[in-house]
Amino acid sequence: MTYTAASLKAELNERGWRLTPQREEILRVFQNLPAGEHLSAEDLYNHLLSRNSPISLSTIYRTLKLMARMGLLRELDLAEDHKHYELNQPLKHHHHLICVSCSKTIEFKSDSVLKIGAKTSEKEGYHLLDCQLTIHGVCPTCQRSLV
């Protein structure tokens, strides 16, 4: 589902929450991110500050968690000590290959992973919301520097 401010407002209202200007601004940032870009809470905070849209870091953390629980954002562990987020686009499933040395991240598609996720979910009676695979390794550049 592609979220607009109106659809986000409707879903938030349905769950007993409201669409605040801060939530709308955070949604807008993620909608305008270039493909393949992921933001941490701190990245988002700095981005908003640079645009003269100061939102407290605690509000950002709460909003990111809420939007991830709603399925609007994907929460990612990208080999760092904090989470990153990206817009969840169900029709654009992709996975991540991450270098544990330099944190270089490559996105890739795999229908096999999605099929396994769908089959396993169905077998266990789950409704599949998202299926993501994260592979951790050492990139060729970092391998050369280890030798």
Curated annotation (Swiss-Prot):
The keyword Transcription regulation applies. One of its GO terms (molecular function) is DNA-binding transcription factor activity. Residues 1-90 are annotated as: DNA-binding. Keywords: Cytoplasm, DNA-binding, Iron, Metal-binding, Repressor, Transcription, Transcription regulation, Zinc. It comes from the Bacteria. The keyword Nucleotidyltransferase does not apply. InterPro entries: FUR (IPR002481), Fur_C (IPR043135), WH-like_DNA-bd_sf (IPR036388), WH_DNA-bd_sf (IPR036390). Residues 91-147 are annotated as: Dimerization. SUPFAM superfamilies: Winged helix' DNA-binding domain (SSF46785). Fe cation binds at residues 93, 95. GO terms for cellular component: cytoplasm. Zn(2+) binds at residues 38, 86, 96, 99, 102, 107. One of its GO terms (biological process) is negative regulation of DNA-templated transcription. It is found in: Cytoplasm. It holds the Pfam family FUR. Homodimer. Acts as a global negative controlling element, employing Fe(2+) as a cofactor to bind the operator of the repressed genes. Regulates genes involved in iron scavenging or photosynthetic electron transport. Belongs to the Fur family. This is Ferric uptake regulation protein. The gene is fur.
